[in-house]
Amino acid sequence: MIKLGSHISFKSPNYLLGAAAESVNNKANCMMIYLGAPQTTKRVSVEKYKYNEYLEKYSKLITPDDIIVHAPYIVNPSSVSKNKFAIDFLVQEIEKMNYIGAKYLVLHPGSYTTFSVQESLDTFIASVKQILSRTKDVVICVETMAGKGAEVGINFDQINYFIHKIRNDRFAVCLDTCHIFDAGYDIRKYEEFKAEINKYNLLPHIKVIHLNDSKNSLGSHKDRHANIDKGFIGLETLAKFVHDPDFDNIPIILETPWVDNKPIYDQEIKMLLEHKAK
């Protein structure tokens, strides 16, 4: 089954109910939310989520398992000096996810800032292990990054290092098409890309996909998302992800820009579902 949806606003007054309603209107069967603004750690009480109303009206169309939560950008679990804040906050975030039954937390691995890359990779691993030990049920999906600035998690070697050091069924991967393209993986050569995935045995670990075109060329390390078929990747390649049987039942989430101050996820979902890749 194809699971296709988008990032959707989770906001007052309807929160989960409103997000699900908008997603269903877009003909989506999964969705991704932030439990607050991506740039802050400010959160409202779970009692405001309108969870019971969502369950009654939309849970058969978008199940709790298909509600992806994205951690805010500002936590840095790879920082040797700031990872304690990230750990404590993410434990609380997962507890909120437990309340609504959400299964996957997408997490940027962070950046090495003034420390070495290896120190930051190992700090991320230690942070995730501690978060997992203090929580239950939720799967942390490390997102593949574009290599902008001091980011870590920017290639399959680093992602594979995380997987093999953490070794936990509650740790997985979120594959972002714009990010890996900007990091230098030419996904337009789709079969070669799939072979690279298989070389690292990453396929069983991919639990979420972010499907975005890229405003910049291959290997640019920029991380600027483009609308579907408006960037350097193109519809033909992106549709292959949607229709690939290897990615059946994996939530595929659009994070594309708004056009004229409004989202066009409904149009992009329709385009991707109708385009049978060659």
From Swiss-Prot:
Q: What cofactor does this one take?
A: Zn(2+)
The residues that hold Zn(2+) 1 are: H70, H108, E143
Keywords (A to Z) from UniProt: DNA damage, DNA repair, Endonuclease, Hydrolase, Metal-binding, Nuclease, Zinc
- On whether Signal is a keyword of this UniProt record, the answer is no
Q: How does the cofactor bind to this protein, according to its record?
A: Binds 3 Zn(2+) ions.
A GO molecular function term, named singly, is: phosphoric diester hydrolase activity
Q: What class of enzyme is it?
A: hydrolase
Any idea of its EC number?
3.1.21.2
Pfam families per UniProt:
AP_endonuc_2
Q: Which domain of life is it from?
A: Bacteria
SUPFAM superfamilies, from UniProt?
A: Xylose isomerase-like
UniProt binding sites for Zn(2+) 2: E143, D176, H210, E255
Gene3D superfamilies, per the entry: Divalent-metal-dependent TIM barrel enzymes (3.20.20.150)
GO biological process, alphabetically ordered:
base-excision repair
Q: Which HAMAP family match?
A: Nfo
Q: What is this protein called?
A: Probable endonuclease 4
Species assigned in the record: Mycoplasmopsis agalactiae (strain NCTC 10123 / CIP 59.7 / PG2)
Primary gene name? nfo
